[in-house]
Amino acid sequence: MIVCAAAVLPPATVSAYNILYAEQYYKLYHQNMYQYPQDFRENVWYLERALKRPFVNPLNAMADIDNKLEWRRYRYLFSMHLNLEMVKQYRRWAAEYDKREAYFYNYPWKQANIKSLSIAEQYYQKALYYWDQALTWWARLRDVEYVELKRVQHWEDEYARIRDGDLDYGAIIQEDLNRLLRVRKDFEEMDEDTY
C-alpha cells in the first residue's frame, strides 16, 4: 500500500533558500561558532562572505532602523563588528599553532615546531589586517551622530572600548608576535647540546 502511494504521489521538491546578504552569512557564522567553536576555517569562511555581501533591506536588519542616520550607523557598526570577529577567529586559529614556550625536550620536533610557529605568524598577521579594517570602520563611525540601535548594543560597546583604549588588538597581537619571535629564536638555537 505504501509503495503504491509513493508511486502515485509526485516527488516532493526540496528547495533551499539563497544566501544573499551579509546578515545571513553572519547568522550562519554565529550558529556554526556555537556548535563548532574550533572550526576556524568555516567560521572565517562565513565572515569573509559576510564582509563581501550587501546588507539586507533596513526592514530586515538586525536592529530597528527607522531613518537614514540609523541605517548608516548600523552599516558602519556591523562592518566594524565583522572585522573584529575576524580578528578573534584568526587569533584563536593562530593559538592552535603557537607555542608559548620552547621547552628543551621538544628538540626532536624542532623543525615541526618552527613550521607551526610560521603558520601561527601568518594567522596573527591576518588578524592584524582585520584589526586595521575594524579601525577604519571605527574611524568612520566617529563622523556619524550617535543614535541608539536596539538589539545591537554590544556593537556600540565594542566601539566605545576601542575609543576608550580598553580594546586594542593591535597591541595584543604585537605581544603575541613578539613572544612568537622569541620562541622561534629559542627553537632555532636548540641543538643536540641543549637537549
Regions found by a protein language model. Name each.
Residues 18, 25, 29, 72, ...:
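Surface positions of alpha-helical coiled-coils, especially the charged/polar e/g heptad sites
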Residues 31-35, 50-53, 57, 100, ...:
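Surface-exposed polar/charged interaction patches
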Residues 78-81, 85-88, 92, 99, ...:
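"A position-specific structural signal for the A-helix of alpha-solenoid helical repeats
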Residues 83-84, 88-93, 123-141, 166-172:
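Amphipathic alpha-helical coiled-coil segments
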Residues 1-8:
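Bacterial N-terminal signal peptides
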Residues 34-38, 45, 64-71, 95-129, ...:
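Short coil/linker segments at helix-helix boundaries
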Residues 10-76, 188-195:
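Immediate post-signal-peptide N-terminus of mature secreted/exported proteins
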Residues 64-81, 139-194:
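TPR/TPR-like alpha-solenoid helical repeat scaffolds
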